[in-house]
Amino acid sequence: MAAAEPSVAALAGGGVGAGAPSGGVPVLFCFSVFARPASVPHGAGYDVLIQKFLSLYGDQVDMHRKFVVQLFAEEWGQYVDLPKGFAVSERCKLRLVPLQIQLTTLGNLTPPSTVFFCCDMQERFRPAIKYFGDIISVGQRLLQGARILGIPVIITEQYPKGLGSTVQEIDLTGVKLVLPKTKFSMVLPEVEAALAEIPGVRSVVLFGVETHVCIQQTALELVGRGIEVHIVADATSSRSMMDRMFALERLARTGIIVTTSEAVPLQLVADKDHPKFKEIQNLIKASAPESGLLSKV
């Protein structure tokens, strides 16, 4: 059941047309907690309504997200998806609803809809990042799992001219892309193009460094594009454990899934009868390092 929207009479001037330009059909445009009256030409369809939403709320609408327009149906007492071919003929209430929060919170992982992102596991970070050796070990195990299951892998290197290449322990065999970057987020134009080439991508499994910088900014940018993000807690770290802790807490509050290197491959196979289960079982037979990453600070 949709949350109650402000009544027409409660709006300024006592009507949805109040404050709306004359000569059109009055419509109440609702988005998030806001409701603004405006008017549109008689017969206005979906494209016109979207443009009106953008003119009213453009500074608040993330254009990378997917939305649905809904119409308040008096018959049902709640909002329903805008009927196909809808055209405005009388005053009505519409709302713009972002889809990805509702559609991507279950946390299911399947090989055809998943991509692995390995972020900036470079040699120059070795002395500075807490438990770097442990996250290299766990990251390498994740990449082995990706190869077993045929999952695409994208790797970035932050300013490799100054910070060096990906550490030698990370096996790049079969990796889809290895890209240099200066931007903190991994969401580069080349990465977006690569994702567009993979049909049905819904989830990204993300790991690397630093948790509170490149990992955090990558995760938030991906979520803004409607992609579900799983951050592997035992494969990400920072120079400061406090930075790492608060970044993971913040990301979890935004709906990003914080998981582990054992949970990910088991979720991907999902069944002991999966043809690759034995290989995954052998991969995770030895537990991940019990490092200080378990500490909060």
Swiss-Prot record:
Phosphotyrosine occurs at which residues? 159
Give the superkingdom in one word: Eukaryota
Give start-end ranges for the coiled-coil region(s): none
Q: In which tissues is it expressed?
A: Specifically expressed in spleen and kidney.
Pfam family for this entry, one: Isochorismatase
Task: Say which family it is in.
Answer: Belongs to the isochorismatase family.
Which protein are we looking at?
A: Isochorismatase domain-containing protein 1
Organism of provenance? Rattus norvegicus (Rat)
Gene name of the encoded protein = Isoc1
